[in-house]
């Protein structure tokens, strides 16, 4: 046996020889294997993983948490889409196995559906930008994979969204890969031929925590549209996210991680199990992807040593990026250092990542903020006693008609003023901050 089983047991023995580990995965992202059927409802690889979990337990003992890291499209069931109507919770025998301590999910679920311009569906709903935290969080338990899906590439291009429904059964969560709460808290019933079985599967509702064994987003434009893809010219699986313009964007990666961790950290979004007394999603064990053991900056700089170094620029790597600070946090810090009360500063309208900022001489906080405003393109406005920082280039937030205006006591209702042509700009000059 020189296959997967031997390799996993070899790693388990290495962990044992090293003194043990806190957690161990018997496999990761094997939907092509776990969905193979030897009969209408028999999944031999799932049983093989159960046997493997028992063998790993015999090596590592009860002090190690053992799990399987399922792909986000795999964990919740097998719906082959072959016209049979079959819908099986095929991994439930594994999730329910006493040797499995948690439900592992490699979470790369999309959190946005952003396009060019302001006419696409999400912008038309009033969301200001793809970086907006409330927008991203609205798609953690909503949007694509929860409320609707795209039936084809043509539908995606035209934003023709098909609602996720379940007919007379009224259990749409069965088909929602984002509906973790319903999947975790309900009994599961297989549906051979589309007909619900009379008895539930082995899964006990709320019986085990969910760990996001991977959680990440590439540092590429509109990465949250399709966080699971990566750009690698040498790979046959190289893709850019849907509607990405292909440039580097550290800010969207940071926005994704902040939105996700903060959302699951809220008690209202993460219920407590009545069986084991802890949260559904065990946030402390959610592992952001990816940290590289190779030392930064030698990786990615030494491409003659590591040939994948060029992929770092647009990839999921966090090494070399999390030392940056969000634009909002930096502006807020400068305001507080200037003595402004915290409740008088609103930076929720800012997005961007600042890799470094050097103040070379004595200057006021306002001067420092002005430099940032020129670079990132934002304005400061005072409303209702609060200084609000707002990015430029957003869609219109209000529309005024003549009926909204008050006529002056004297003169015309509307007055047009023409500027002196010699005072208007004669040329446009710009410089590239980062290409």
Identify the role of each PLM range.
Residues 29-32, 71-76, 215-218, 288-297, ...:
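Short, internal active-site loops enriched in acidic
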Residues 1-3, 25, 29-40, 169-175, ...:
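N-terminal substrate-binding region of glycoside hydrolase catalytic domains
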Residues 222-325:
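Aromatic-rich peripheral "rim/lid" segments of glycoside hydrolase catalytic domains that contact
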